Structure formats: structure tokens, C-alpha cells
């Protein structure tokens, strides 16, 4: 087992932080966006097998958010097929639900976004070993990926499962569910596209509930939504969901439709 993750050391200087956009200036509004000044690429140790698998497969199945001004993705070229729905999962973690859901929606392109490299390495391993052909991965902050890498009305769905609740009041400004992010997601969704959010944190659920109608382009559909055009059953209990259930937390889910 390797004790170091040399790949990051070769490509990113010490203290490197992902590019951070001034969203209010970028979009010309005064909406609320996460303030993530302390966020950086999280380091972690990969096993030798994970490193070998990463080196062999990441150039094909993965992309890194960089300092380049424009990294727009050609989804059809990346997946090698045209005319298929595309769903973005923000904060895929170790990819447990991603890998479980993908085979059930093989006609849908799934793009998993995560900062933590060992989490992406686990998902990459599951994708390669399971011969899952409809998953691609991006290493970067989800809001920046939406801004820099995805054109308007390019997505059929966005999933945000168990985002960091940032429970301390002084950290609430870091929560991803904010008025500005909902506006950004709405702009990237096609009409009829679906936003699905799940949390096990009661205070965060209340926070989100106060925002369900804040974005005029999104129609809140509640939960469950029997006629939802996309898969909403996560199939497995994710790591963070399991921790919440162990503490008797209630899972609260939200669904919106792009008008």
C-alpha cells in the first residue's frame, strides 16, 4: 500500500485551492452563493492498485477543474453518444449511490463531481470493475463546475445527496443550497429538468424548506413525486446517510422541476 499520493504533488503546488469565481459579478446579481474561502483540494492516500487504475483510466473517464477560464464540456464527445439525457451529481463522495444507480439508467449520462480524490478513486474502481459505461467524473467544486464547465440548458437533472450541513451558525454561508446556486442550477437545467436534494440534517432541511420557492425558474414538486421522469431511488444507503440513520436522523428529500 502506498503511503503517499504523488500525483497531486506533481500537478498542484502546496496550498493550492481550486479556482473561485466572484459569482455576483459573474452573473450580475445579488443572490447568495457559498463562501468557500477555506476549501482546497483534499489530499488522501491511494493504494498502489488505485493509483495504477487512476493513471490508466482517469484521462478517459475523468476531468479536473483547472484555472482555465473556459472548460466547457462536449458531453456527446466525452460519452461517445448523442441524444441521451445527462445528470450531474454534485458531491458524489465515494460513489456508492452513483455506481448503484447508473446501471439502472444506462441510457442516461451521469457526471459525478467530487473534490476528494480517494472518493473519486473508489468510484472509478467501481466503474471500471463493473464495466459501467455511462459514468464520467470531474474533480472540482460543484458550483464552479456548473459555472465553468456546463453550458446553459445542458442538463436533464442535478443531484445533491447529503451535502455538508455546515451545522455551526457561522458556517451556514458555506452551505451549497443558497438562492444563487438554485438560480445557477436552474440555468443549467433544460425545461422539465429535475433537481433532487436529500439531507439527514434537520436544521439543513429547515434551511432548504425556506428556499423551495425562492427561484422562479424552479417549480417545487415536493416529495415523493410519483410522476418524476428520473430515477430517485438511491438503491443503497450511502456512507453519510448510514451515519445519519444510526443517529435516528430523518431523511428529508426535495424535488424541483425546471419550468
Swiss-Prot record:
Enzyme class: transferase
Record-listed E.C. numbers: 2.1.1.33
PROSITE patterns: SAM_MT_TRMB
InterPro entries from the UniProt entry: SAM-dependent_MTases_sf, tRNA_(Gua-N-7)_MeTrfase_Trmb, tRNA_methyltr_TrmB_bact
One Pfam family of this chain: Methyltransf_4
Catalytic residues identified in the record: 164
Pathway annotation from the record: tRNA modification; N(7)-methylguanine-tRNA biosynthesis
Binding-site residues, S-adenosyl-L-methionine: 89, 114, 141, 164
One GO MF term attached to the UniProt entry: tRNA (guanine(46)-N7)-methyltransferase activity
Keyword Transferase found: yes
Top-rank taxon: Bacteria
SUPFAM superfamilies the record matches: S-adenosyl-L-methionine-dependent methyltransferases
Catalytic activity: guanosine(46) in tRNA + S-adenosyl-L-methionine = N(7)-methylguanosine(46) in tRNA + S-adenosyl-L-homocysteine
Disordered: region residues: 1-29
Assigned keywords, A-Z: Methyltransferase, S-adenosyl-L-methionine, Transferase, tRNA processing
Cellular compartments per GO CC: tRNA methyltransferase complex
Record: residues binding substrate: 168, 200, 238-241
Family of this protein: Belongs to the class I-like SAM-binding methyltransferase superfamily. TrmB family.
Record's function text: Catalyzes the formation of N(7)-methylguanine at position 46 (m7G46) in tRNA.
Name used for this protein in its record: tRNA (guanine-N(7)-)-methyltransferase
Organism for this UniProt entry: Corynebacterium diphtheriae (strain ATCC 700971 / NCTC 13129 / Biotype gravis)
Lineage, opening ranks: Bacteria, Bacillati, Actinomycetota, Actinomycetes, Mycobacteriales
Gene: trmB
